[in-house]
């Protein structure tokens, strides 16, 4: 069995997690109390979903997941919510005081009191697996817990489970919408360890997803629930081939192999199509070619970043539903002929495709229409550097005046860590620049950085 353990850290991680597990349960016909009525056996008794759920003796299905937060309110919502019986109480770990938007509190003072408990629980889940494949880590880098405790946990996971792959789903600060003043600090400090300790990191940003909800679903004032349900569809599409059977299954380690050309260049853009409301869906025939084109639209990207400003290094297209390989090949062929979608000259093929026959499930009363087929694209594009340069610029403005730095130093950080993290990100921006540069003559000096 190739199990995956999900780790949800901080408010963003937990709320995205709630949306994901709600969707997984619907997809597999698992009730909120973890029972799976035998008449609803998905896929004729195929147990592929055991990659995400473990079955107890009593026939209850328990998510292989841990929820961690430094303060109790968000986790208490899980403890009292619809799915309270789904999780073992030990899987929900909460502290008493929060990280107060401070990376140093999440990483040093308060985080380190709880991290051993988390690792203990993760170890229990890991011992319950026959062939642990890797970890899916959900967090945001703008706050204190997601960034600080998130980095700390990733560092410790690297020590304890060196070879296991770690996929990050990371919410980055948006260009216009900000939830805290010190976001740039937390993001830079946290990305510093994401660079080292995740194998693939998928960037999400609230503003981009707000825009998709407004534009494609005509929701005037999207809530976090709207956003998270959209994100959960992306994550469900990525993990569908671990949980169902299909024609072209894609493993977690396969993402890594196909998307990451150099170890540091592992920050991905994601997009999903069709994002369409029920009213419109009746009037549209969403062919494979249409949804594929739509996935490449800059407006479909779930991070504010324009792929036309950079070049693609690799793409992973995960189709689900009524899709056959012939259609996929035709659609990809069309994309390759488009001049607007540019690939780097050293990566001529650039496409990895997966097909899964399970059509996308929608949450009842949700915003998305039930469709026959959908595609999720994860792409590695040099334009991701935009996201980092934006944060770096804001970081520099604040750090030049050493604004707010005393809060971090007071929690046991050293100023040197700021400049070290900032230099690391400057190097990352440069790496992206070099990777996108034309020509094959500068390949020899690539060696110093790795």
Curated annotation (Swiss-Prot):
Keywords, in A-Z order: Acetylation, Cytoplasm, Cytoskeleton, GTP-binding, Hydrolase, Magnesium, Metal-binding, Microtubule, Nucleotide-binding, Phosphoprotein
Gene Ontology BP terms: microtubule-based process
Known cofactor(s): Mg(2+)
Predominant subcellular localization, coarse grouping: cytoplasm
Positions marked as site (Involved in polymerization): 450
Keyword Repeat recorded: no
Documented EC number(s): 3.6.5.-
GO CC terms: cytoplasm; microtubule
InterPro entries assigned to the protein according to its UniProt record, in alphabetical order: Alpha_tubulin, Tub_FtsZ_C, Tubulin, Tubulin/FtsZ-like_C, Tubulin/FtsZ_2-layer-sand-dom, Tubulin/FtsZ_GTPase_sf, Tubulin_C, Tubulin_CS
Post-translational modification: Undergoes a tyrosination/detyrosination cycle, the cyclic removal and re-addition of a C-terminal tyrosine residue by the enzymes tubulin tyrosine carboxypeptidase (TTCP) and tubulin tyrosine ligase (TTL), respectively.
UniProt: GTP binding residues: 11, 71, 144-145, 179, 206, 228
UniProt cross-references to PANTHER family, sorted A to Z: TUBULIN
Protein name per Swiss-Prot or TrEMBL: Tubulin alpha-2 chain
Gene source species: Arabidopsis thaliana (Mouse-ear cress)
Source lineage: Eukaryota, Viridiplantae, Streptophyta, Embryophyta, Tracheophyta
